[in-house]
Amino acid sequence: MGEHLSGRLQRALLVLALMLGAALVAVSPLTAAERNSYTVTPLVSDQPGVAAQTDPNLVNAWGLTSGPTSPWWVSDNGTDKSTLYRGSDGAIQQLVVDVAGGPTGAVFNPTAGFVLPTGGKALFIFDSEDGKIRAWNGAQGTTAIVSKDRSGEDAIYKGLAIADTSAGPRLYAADFHNARVDVFDGNFGVVPGGFVDVSLPSGYAPFGIQTIGDRVFVTYARQDADAEDEVAGQSLGFVDVFSTAGDLLGRVAQHGQLNAPWGLALAPSTFGRFAGDLLVGNFGDGQINAYEELPNGQFEHRGELQSSDGRSISIDGLWALQFGKAGNNGPAGTLFFTAGPDEETHGLFGSITPG
């Protein structure tokens, strides 16, 4: 009898061991590409001790752009400057450009257009909250000069994008006050029409704007009572996608996790769990949401970038999102960001990497 029980017990233990082994196989650790785990690295701050580098000019770091091999150019909204940083370590570059009017958006000019009034095509272009477009090339020394003035129409520019289209070079400025996208040709002439979404509720205006491939993505935030600044809050936001001619192609996202969205970037194949997804950064809560484009052209929310502890990454005052290009602007798989922490009274430039 005892031997019979012992045999049954052995068989039961064997079955249990096999089941546990199968379970362990089923719950094998996620690969690096599957894990929602990202690391934030502060590179430059205006405050000592916050990042590896300290630069007092970096206050309310907003727009972020670079040429194919250039360092990053940052719009310092709080100091009316543009400062330059190397992507690999945030090393501060010697050139500092004066950009008056509270610069917000910034773009590198890859086109043959946008010649400055003083001669030569612009290399970098900025828009500002004073409703003016300013541009710079090496002949200007350390000052970006006014190339288009829309202050007479009370424009308040919050973002800037650029494209080289079949109709010629185009510059797109998000006029938050007048709730429109101003489009300029390669001579800084106004191109009327386009960038209209009649389904948007009143009180929302273009906030951030970014050319990705052959499309232009626009974020919308709620206007305050004076239509000068955004209103933060959970679900307060929209994202649309347009052709470079300004034709509405569709709605990317609305409400949900959006909170005064501004930054936009398309993740490369090396960016972990959200590789290939559209990343949308919230100024309102500092979180970054990922959206997958489906075969039918619609977008599906996939989640928020998280740190290794499983918490959503939140960067106070988050503005721009841009990936490196493997030159002085850092590795192609690294996401760089700007921010204006503490109610835009300070500045931060940093990076985000998978893992």
Protein language model regions, located:
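Bacterial N-terminal signal peptides that target proteins for export
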Residues: 2-16
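Sequence/structural signature of beta-propeller domains
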Residues: 30-355
